[in-house]
Amino acid sequence: MTLLALGINHKTAPVSLRERVSFSPDKLDQALDSLLAQPMVQGGVVLSTCNRTELYLSVEERDDLQEALIRWLCDYHNLNEDDLRNSLYWHQDNDAVSHLMRVASGLDSLVLGEPQILGQVKKAFADSQKGHMKASELERMFQKSFSVAKRVRTETDIGASAVSVAFAACTLARQIFESLSTVTVLLVGAGETIELVARHLREHKVQKMIIANRTRERAQILADEVGAEVIALSDIDERLREADIIISSTASPLPIIGKGMVERALKSRRNQPMLLVDIAVPRDVEPEVGKLANAYLYSVDDLQSIISHNLAQRKAAAVEAETIVAQEASEFMAWLRAQSASETIRDYRSQAEQVRDELTAKALAALEQGGDAQTIMQDLAWKLTNRLIHAPTKSLQQAARDGDNERLNILRDSLGLE
């Protein structure tokens, strides 16, 4: 049995190829069935995200293994093998285990240390268990990877610092306000960055969210997801006073929030402080707002400096994380190698027990028939000894005849002979 990890990711393939190799969720069962129908595949997990498509497999070793799996992947996606081959990576046994642990821990992600990948790996594993997981070694590898990812996040600072604009904006808000459970946040825009911000805020149980956007339909979809209120951009002037935090990211060519608008809001708030995070380019908030007392304005450049500092911290933490992964992968492979001997040990013990039971039964029968106990016990001991050493003796004799000193030494060591 061999463990494999093969696939492509953001480092080896452009999005034009990644999208062709991805597995759609509604056809994943079909893909897994097709994969497990391959004669060499004993168990499989398919991980398919926007940044990677990977197969984690337990397989029987054979000469054409790599060619057969590449052929299956290309046939399934109607790809030319040459298109895929140059972008494909292939990891086996210890390298496969290390790769999965690195992926689950966020060490192989586009954003170093990002936590979302662990959930994606867990979902891929759960999907594979719906009648598809057949290899206990593969299952154990995934379970171990989950615990390693948890250890990495617990013992290092890999996820402690924000390295995305959206996460940095939320981190800044949480640093300034002791708790988000008592604040109102106004989000201006409804694009991808604001979507991420809204989800981060929901996770931190913000008291209230208001989304202002040019088109209500797009904002309403996000609002329904995070439990927010939707308003028009034209309503910002009137509603700004309610917001303790304003995070803005639109594509407007001109500022949406001006100095006068913020002055009026601060006056209505009796000068309670406002945090404004402008992550738009061009800027959504007039720079002069930052000169107002109790208005704390941060631009995307301010966040980038935070991100750069935090990324350096993450890279330092990643060195610690890599050490953990190397150690855990080595220990897992040692466990796996030990398991490969378990079946042999069970068979050997079972064989010895059968000999014992057979000869003991004959000895007891002889005793019941009135035979001499000492003679019967000596006969039992002699037969038991001969039966148990018969196979090892033959192996030793054959090794000697073959002149195989290495095998002789291994057998001597196995039998506990000095």
Curated annotation (Swiss-Prot):
Site (Important for activity) residue list: 99
CDD domains: NAD_bind_Glutamyl_tRNA_reduct
Known catalytic reactions: (S)-4-amino-5-oxopentanoate + tRNA(Glu) + NADP(+) = L-glutamyl-tRNA(Glu) + NADPH + H(+)
Coiled coil spans: none
Residues binding substrate, per UniProt: 49-52, 109, 114-116, 120
Miscellaneous section: During catalysis, the active site Cys acts as a nucleophile attacking the alpha-carbonyl group of tRNA-bound glutamate with the formation of a thioester intermediate between enzyme and glutamate, and the concomitant release of tRNA(Glu). The thioester intermediate is finally reduced by direct hydride transfer from NADPH, to form the product GSA.
Protein name: Glutamyl-tRNA reductase
Organism: Escherichia coli O45:K1 (strain S88 / ExPEC)
Top-level taxonomy: Bacteria, Pseudomonadati, Pseudomonadota, Gammaproteobacteria, Enterobacterales
Name of the coding gene: hemA
